[in-house]
């Protein structure tokens, strides 16, 4: 097949380390499986929040592409990102945490059972609920704060100059909160 446009040659230093594709795939599978389990839990009366992350599994690749020091403000369906980051940390239990969140357990480390929330201080992921675009102004503020003197930055576990990653869905792009950010 002939193309109407030239393709750039791949960069020579883009080889993925051995095993990395498998770890990304594992995070994607865990994200999808948690969605299936949450729906079963809802059907049996053991879960109360079933808006899952199906269709957003490739956010695991994004998590692998950025530094753990980078601050993340995630779309509420981007559990694969959090799962991927947590897989590299022995201090996090992403599967347990998400299941606690779906079941509105008071043991949920992020919301204490009030809502299904993605987020983790350990993983530099700001807590985010399903409110459309509400995290965009926070992301802009965090990005602005990076340029402030270190004494004013409140991100305790950020060791290097981070970037701020913010993901959002199509409904957010036309929301006034997004436009304001």
Stretches with model-predicted labels:
Residues 1-47, 69, 96:
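Cofactor-/ligand-binding subdomain signature composed of acidic, glycine-rich
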Residues 33-36, 43-181:
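Cofactor-binding active-site loop characterized by glycine-rich and histidine/acidic residues
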């Amino acid at each position: 097949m002939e193309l109407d446009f030239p393709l750039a040659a791949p960069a020579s230093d883009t080889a993925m380390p051995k095993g990395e594709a498998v770890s990304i795939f594992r995070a994607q599978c865990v994200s999808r499986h948690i969605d299936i389990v949450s729906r079963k839990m809802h059907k049996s009366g053991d879960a109360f929040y079933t808006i899952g992350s199906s269709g957003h599994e490739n956010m695991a690749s994004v998590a692998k592409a950025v530094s753990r020091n980078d601050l993340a403000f995630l779309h509420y369906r981007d559990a694969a990102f959090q799962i991927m980051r947590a897989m590299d940390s022995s201090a996090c239990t992403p599967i347990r945490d998400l299941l606690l969140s779906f079941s509105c357990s008071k043991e949920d480390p992020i919301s204490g059972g009030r809502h299904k929330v993605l987020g983790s201080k350990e993983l530099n992921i700001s807590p985010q609920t399903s409110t459309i675009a509400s995290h965009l102004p926070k992301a802009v503020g965090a990005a602005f704060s990076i340029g402030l003197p270190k004494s004013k930055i409140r991100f305790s576990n950020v060791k290097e100059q981070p970037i701020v990653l913010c993901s959002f869905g199509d409904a957010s792009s036309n929301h006034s909160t997004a436009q304001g950010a």
